[in-house]
């Protein structure tokens, strides 16, 4: 499962360059943002907590984008070695760990042999719930698999997750009440929140609480390269010690992103080895990992206190915003503009770019552990997979468990599999919100710009009837944008779409759909903002309807806003494992 997702970004970059050369003024797009401030750089001899936490995440390759946010939201690793089964070591033939840090979730699948006997297990934790599965995703689809609740295993599994090579610095930042070290105060000293720093034998030692495990305290000792060589967690009468070494980028050679992970890992409980692993491969680029909790597990588990929310940076917490310039402030006291028939008038130009991308301001500088041939421009392309908005948020579509690996595989081969890379439209709802709207009493027209969802796609348009007509059951034509009809529910415009083809994705990350997809979009204008809500149903591939994170479109007063260049031609070239497209 490996593919250089960044390779396709070269084509996307061409599109951006061409778009920048299109005959649009800066004011037409709301103006460009000011240059980013110089990045925080600790002094070489800095020994305060801010410097140590920053160096920890920086040296591990966890900082992404020109703003250097910590953006490792999910990962997988595979390994070999031994695990303890019934108190005795068992030689692994399979070990696969899938982690979602945003939801405090981890699924570990292993198979091992001892004395001619095969053992296997699927161990899962998600927030305050723990269980074992007989098949991956047991009970998420009714009648498929068996989930066995194990409430007594929650604490040990959360400790393993948050003491892991990437989990430990995240937990330390969580304890410091700041998800980005470079945002800590300069005078923080050796303490911030519940996270403390000491120096022992010339090495930084960071102490922090384990999220979700009251009373559990971790002590991480970092080496000269600011990577954890040991993390010791004390919780009641149990001491769990994790030893790490041989840090490297273990991703496939086709998708090196220079995020480091430990190659050697040993776990001991009260001095006894329980797991000894050698990493064979990682996938650190925000891979699709979901850990939904079966209803039977929730019913069997008593949760006495709310589980702590894992802090996320503002980029992740804010699901909408203008890419270019500052959005207009909502005129809350201004009367609602209405048409002659009394409907809210949505005619106008709208800042509809959604997301915060590294190429807003420029390229990320090379980090201290990156290869000698690193360039900021190269970082821009590798960071793309971390910053594409549909890939880093916790609100991902929940696919049927048997399709989870397919989503990952499509993601790995995005540049060949993503339909937009072969010149096809983004489709609905991936196209995002419209840049310009024309409204009449009978229909509404949307004009879309290009570059949505991290740089892909072309300008497109939709003309949608809003006269309460129903879908034509005789129209069997499938379309990229579907067959859409609209009606008003009070002051909300509701668009109902069916009749899609299966040649678009819901977003970057392999989020495919079937031709049975049904999409409902809602547009509600208040002042000079439009709330854009989307619900996607696709029982062929999804476990449940996907309710997309609401977005806001903000009015742009410039008369040139919403102008888009003509949809260009597109040519596709096959380059071994890379599909390259040139727009002109």
Where are these regions (language model features)?
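N-terminal secretory signal peptides that target proteins for export/translocation
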Residues: 1-6
């Amino acid at each position: 499962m490996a593919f250089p997702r960044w390779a396709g970004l070269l084509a996307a970059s061409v599109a951006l360059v061409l778009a920048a050369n299109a005959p649009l003024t800066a004011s037409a797009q709301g103006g460009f943002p000011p240059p980013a401030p110089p990045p925080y750089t600790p002094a070489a001899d800095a020994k305060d907590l801010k410097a140590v936490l920053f160096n920890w995440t920086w040296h591990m390759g966890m900082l992404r984008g020109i703003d250097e946010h910590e953006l490792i939201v999910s990962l997988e690793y595979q390994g070999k070695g031994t695990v303890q089964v019934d108190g005795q070591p068992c030689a692994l033939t399979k070990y696969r760990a899938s982690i979602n840090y945003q939801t405090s979730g981890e699924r570990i699948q292993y198979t091992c042999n001892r004395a001619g006997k095969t053992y296997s297990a699927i161990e899962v934790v998600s927030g305050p719930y723990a269980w074992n599965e007989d098949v991956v995703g047991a009970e998420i689809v009714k009648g498929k698999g068996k989930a066995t609740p194990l409430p007594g295993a929650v604490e040990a599994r959360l400790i393993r997750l948050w003491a892991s090579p990437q989990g430990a610095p995240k937990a330390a930042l969580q304890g410091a009440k700041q998800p980005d070290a470079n945002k800590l105060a300069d005078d923080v000293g050796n303490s911030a929140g519940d996270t403390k720093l000491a120096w022992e034998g010339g090495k930084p030692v960071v102490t922090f609480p384990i999220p979700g495990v009251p009373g559990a305290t971790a002590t991480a000792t970092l080496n000269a390269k600011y990577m954890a060589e040991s993390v010791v967690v004390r919780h009641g009468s149990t001491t769990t010690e994790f030893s790490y070494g041989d840090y490297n980028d273990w991703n496939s050679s086709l998708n090196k992103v220079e995020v480091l992970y430990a190659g050697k890992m040993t776990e001991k409980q009260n001095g006894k080895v329980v797991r000894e692993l050698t990493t064979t491969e990682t996938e650190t680029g925000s891979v699709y990992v979901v850990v939904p909790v079966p209803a039977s597990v929730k019913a069997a588990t008593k949760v006495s206190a709310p589980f702590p929310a894992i802090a996320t940076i503002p980029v992740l917490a804010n699901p909408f915003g203008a890419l270019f310039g500052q959005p207009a402030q909502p005129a809350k006291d201004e009367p609602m503009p209405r048409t002659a028939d009394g409907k809210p008038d949505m005619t106008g130009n709208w800042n509809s770019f959604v997301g915060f991308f590294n190429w807003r301001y420029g390229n990320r500088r090379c980090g201290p552990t990156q290869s000698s041939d690193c360039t900021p421009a190269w970082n821009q392309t590798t960071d793309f997979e971390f910053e594409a908005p549909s890939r880093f948020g916790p609100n991902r579509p929940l696919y049927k468990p048997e399709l989870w690996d397919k989503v990952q595989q499509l993601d790995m081969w995005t540049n060949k599999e993503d339909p937009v890379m072969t010149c096809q439209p983004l489709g609905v709802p991936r196209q995002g919100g419209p840049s310009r709207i024309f409204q009449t009493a009978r229909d509404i027209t949307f004009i879309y710009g290009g570059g949505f969802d991290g740089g892909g796609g072309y300008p497109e348009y939709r003309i949608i009837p809003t006269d309460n007509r129903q879908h034509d059951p005789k129209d069997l034509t499938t379309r990229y944008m579907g067959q859409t009809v609209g009606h008003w529910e009070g002051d909300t415009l509701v668009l109902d779409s069916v009749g899609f083809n299966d040649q678009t994705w819901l977003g970057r990350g392999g989020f495919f759909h079937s031709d049975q997809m049904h999409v409902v979009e809602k547009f509600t204008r208040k002042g000079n903002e439009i709330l854009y809500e989307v619900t996607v149903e696709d029982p062929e591939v999804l476990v449940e309807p996907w309710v997309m994170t609401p977005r806001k479109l903000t009015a742009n007063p410039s008369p040139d806003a919403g102008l888009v260049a003509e949809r260009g031609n597109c040519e596709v070239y096959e380059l071994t494992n890379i599909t390259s497209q040139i727009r002109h």
